[in-house]
Amino acid sequence: MKNWTDVIGKEKEQPYFQHALQQVHLARANGKTIYPPQEEVFNAFKYTAFEDVKVVILGQDPYHGANQAHGLAFSVKPEVAIPPSLLNMYKELTQDISGFQMPSNGYLVKWAEQGVLLLNTVLTVERGMAHSHANLGWERFTDKVIAVLNEHREKLVFLLWGSHAQKKDKLIDRTRHLVLTAPHPSPLSAHRGFFGCHHFSKTNSYLESNGMKPIDWQI
């Protein structure tokens, strides 16, 4: 069975990837605060092995507030206030999954360890400046991640929320994977169709119908 090193190891040797790492390193060296911390940039791949991926939830770029981002899309450290988008995800879960209790924290490692790849399309951000690293080359890398999952795995669930995530639809073969789309869970758009999308129960129904263990969404 392939692992992350097999499928994207060579990508890390590409000039564009080295350039992205170098730009982030320079920014840190020049005293800028970059999130997440250096040792947590690739946490999505640390917590969810390639062969264990069942579900992919795409985010855009990391949270840009202090102590929030730790390398998993939508997730924050246990002691940090739950951000609005994640709070709306929890609200949908309380309606969608029988018995789901509103969590007291936003630390989603439990999802990641069950095979939910929480992948931001851009892996770093400067403090207080959303999308500040959007042009560093990270998206080329994360597009490759999506492409290799599409190619080398079968029957994954891709949750694409909002227009940015939905641009990645073209990288996914819908005859071999389940793609679910909805507006972004942010307070600006959640009421336009994220609430009531039932993506969490639909994900579990698909997994179970294909002989896989459902995700325990409770945090």
UniProtKB/Swiss-Prot annotation:
CDD domains: UDG-F1-like (cd10027). InterPro entries: UDG_fam1, Ura-DNA_Glyclase_AS, Uracil-DNA_glycosylase-like, Uracil-DNA_glycosylase-like_sf. One of its GO terms (cellular component) is cytoplasm. GO terms for molecular function: uracil DNA N-glycosylase activity. Its EC number is 3.2.2.27. The active site is at residue 61. Keywords: Cytoplasm, DNA damage, DNA repair, Hydrolase. GO terms for biological process: base-excision repair, AP site formation via deaminated base removal. It comes from the Bacteria. It catalyses: Hydrolyzes single-stranded DNA or mismatched double-stranded DNA and polynucleotides, releasing free uracil. The keyword DNA repair applies. It is found in: Cytoplasm. Excises uracil residues from the DNA which can arise as a result of misincorporation of dUMP residues by DNA polymerase or due to deamination of cytosine. Belongs to the uracil-DNA glycosylase (UDG) superfamily. UNG family. This is Uracil-DNA glycosylase. It comes from Haemophilus influenzae (strain PittEE).
